[in-house]
């Protein structure tokens, strides 16, 4: 085994629904109150994981959150039995119940930020769960996210787990959706690239006007310090506020990177020429930028198709594959541009699309669904092996989903006490399948 970039995808939870909770995420709001299909959603995610496993990539699975989150609803003043808490919250504040029932943890690009051992001062892999304070429904995730990460990467000889940053607007952190890493080989020192939307302390920085900037410069700097990153190999850049106002709520909706390649839109960053120069200076010779011009692909097309919310991955033969949502194939302008790219041989060699409709309608493409974790040979062996995709796990999880998941959920179903029973039964069995221990509040 050699050092690899593994992908750990989030398993879609049993309460997957369309509550339109994410302001600034156009797909999420436009599908609000639609009827979701959790069983189809989890199977679409599993199909993507299995396909990458079959291609020879190291593919892991991260467990979902416990939802509905009865513990949080009790903290917010709803009392009685669990079924009474559900009934009262739906009666008096259906928005709170929806927020506490969200399956948004499927998008593990927001689970946290990961720095490989080649980049850190102590030579260990560092994890920091994202606090996600910009959206209430996601701000209640980080404690259990930390539990899941610790159960997946438990060996203290190789892995270091930090607490989420303080829950404050000053340190708004959205995890790996605003972070990428460039390197020549995965096991060598890389350049870690942090993208922020605003500065909390310095008012001279520009900021979006219509939609919130979810990541602060101060949060990104704090994570770089916490992970022990080397200053000369760390680059901070500001996302273009204008594209945030057009629905680009995370950097991974307008740019994606891998090894020596940055694939981004022409309007992705503020002072884009300087950003490219800073990255090239830190990386050295051979840094490759594929910049998509606005006259080829508009920001609107990029957001609607999630062109950049794709996975750039290097195959065993050294060629680069891009994993795209099926929406890209269905947009003639985007698909024509992608095929031009492949013909030009400028760093992307192969296109592969997946049908991720259930996730896409809630505002998350292929890149949202995965957390990248670079692992050397010893670290791969130290991972909880029961969380790694295999023929057996794929079959087991599909049968598990058939047993526990509904094929239809609408808003009123979130108040059904039976959904809570079903969800907890599913998660209890999942922790046994994946050998995670008691990671959920209901198991304590």
Swiss-Prot record:
A GO BP term here is:
arginine catabolic process to succinate
Asked if the Swiss-Prot or TrEMBL record annotates the protein with the keyword Hydrolase, the reply is: yes
Keywords assigned: Arginine metabolism, Hydrolase
**Which reactions does this protein catalyse?**
N(2)-succinyl-L-arginine + 2 H2O + 2 H(+) = N(2)-succinyl-L-ornithine + 2 NH4(+) + CO2
Q: What Gene Ontology terms describe what this protein does at the molecular function level? A: N-succinylarginine dihydrolase activity
Q: In which pathway does it act?
A: Amino-acid degradation; L-arginine degradation via AST pathway; L-glutamate and succinate from L-arginine: step 2/5
Give the enzyme's EC designation: 3.5.3.23
Q: Where does substrate bind?
A: 19-28, 110, 137-138, 214, 252, 362
Identify the SUPFAM superfamilies for this entry: Pentein
Q: What Pfam families has UniProt attached to this entry?
A: AstB
The catalytic residues are: 174, 250, 368 (nucleophile)
What is the protein's known function? Catalyzes the hydrolysis of N(2)-succinylarginine into N(2)-succinylornithine, ammonia and CO(2).
Q: Which HAMAP family match?
A: AstB
Q: How does it assemble?
A: Homodimer.
Family of the protein in this entry = Belongs to the succinylarginine dihydrolase family.
Name recorded for this polypeptide: N-succinylarginine dihydrolase
**Taxonomic placement:** Bacteria, Pseudomonadati, Pseudomonadota, Gammaproteobacteria, Vibrionales
| Annotated gene | astB
């Amino acid at each position: 085994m050699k050092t690899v970039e593994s992908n750990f995808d989030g398993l879609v939870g049993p309460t997957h629904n369309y509550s339109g909770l994410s302001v600034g995420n156009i797909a999420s709001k436009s599908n609000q109150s639609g009827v979701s299909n959790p069983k189809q959603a989890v199977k679409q995610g599993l199909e993507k994981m299995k396909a990458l496993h079959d291609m020879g990539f190291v593919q892991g699975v991260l467990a979902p959150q416990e939802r509905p989150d009865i513990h949080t609803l009790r903290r917010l003043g709803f009392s009685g039995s669990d079924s009474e808490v559900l009934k009262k919250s739906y009666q008096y504040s259906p928005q709170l119940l929806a927020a506490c029932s969200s399956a948004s943890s499927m998008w593990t690009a927001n689970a946290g930020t990961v720095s490989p051992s080649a980049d850190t001062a102590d030579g260990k892999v560092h994890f920091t769960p994202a606090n996600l304070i910009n959206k209430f429904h996601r701000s209640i995730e980080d404690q259990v996210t930390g539990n899941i990460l610790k159960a997946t990467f438990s060996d203290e000889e190789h892995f270091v787990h930090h607490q989420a940053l303080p829950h404050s607007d000053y340190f708004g952190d959205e995890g790996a959706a605003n972070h990428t890493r460039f390197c020549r080989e995965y096991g060598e020192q890389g350049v870690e690239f942090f993208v922020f939307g605003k500065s909390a302390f310095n008012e001279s920085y520009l900021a979006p006007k219509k939609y919130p900037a979810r990541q602060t410069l101060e949060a990104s700097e704090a994570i770089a310090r916490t992970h022990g990153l080397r200053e000369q190999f760390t680059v901070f850049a500001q996302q273009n506020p204008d594209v945030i106002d057009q629905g680009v709520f995370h950097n991974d909706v307008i740019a994606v990177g891998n090894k020596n390649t940055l694939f981004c839109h022409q309007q992705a960053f503020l002072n884009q020429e300087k950003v490219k120069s800073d990255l090239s200076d830190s990386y050295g010779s051979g840094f490759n930028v594929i910049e998509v011009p606005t006259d080829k692909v508009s920001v609107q097309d990029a957001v609607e198709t999630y062109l950049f919310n794709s996975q750039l991955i290097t195959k065993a033969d050294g060629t680069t594959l891009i994993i795209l949502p099926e929406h890209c194939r269905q947009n003639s302008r985007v698909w024509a541009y992608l095929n031009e790219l492949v013909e030009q041989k400028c760093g992307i060699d192969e296109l592969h699309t997946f049908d991720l409709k259930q996730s896409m309608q809630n505002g998350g493409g292929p890149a949202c669904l995965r957390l990248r974790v670079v692992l050397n040979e010893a670290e791969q062996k130290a991972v909880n092996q029961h969380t790694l995709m295999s023929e057996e796990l794929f079959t087991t999880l599909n049968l598990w989903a058939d047993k526990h998941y509904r094929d239809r959920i609408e808003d009123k179903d979130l108040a059904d006490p039976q959904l809570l029973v079903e969800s907890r039964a599913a998660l209890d069995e999942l922790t046994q399948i994946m050998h995670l221990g008691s990671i959920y509040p209901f198991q304590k």
